[in-house]
From Swiss-Prot:
Its main location: secreted. Disulfide bonds join C56-C68, C57-C66, C62-C69. It comes from Conus leopardus (Leopard cone). Keywords: Cleavage on pair of basic residues, Disulfide bond, Secreted, Signal, Toxin. This is Conotoxin Lp3.2.
């Protein structure tokens, strides 16, 4: 009876745990790698926003993504 319990425990508990794929085993999808096909302006905007910096804009074109140079 003990041997049957060990066999059942092995196949019902340990075997599924061993075959379960954990989150750490998954490949990482990087945002920048997925965005390689962006044009340079969109890429620069993404990099600047990630760095927390804003670009300098000429006075009539100032908006929330940049600050006025003059």
């Amino acid at each position: 009876m003990l041997k049957m319990g060990v066999v059942l425990f092995t196949f019902l508990v340990l075997f599924p745990l061993a075959t379960l794929q954990l989150d750490a085993d998954q490949p990482v999808e990087r945002y920048a790698e997925n965005k390689q096909d962006l044009n340079p302006n969109e890429r620069m905007k993404m990099i600047m926003s990630a760095l927390g910096q804003r670009r300098c804009c000429i006075s009539p074109a100032c908006h929330e993504e940049c600050y006025c140079c003059q």
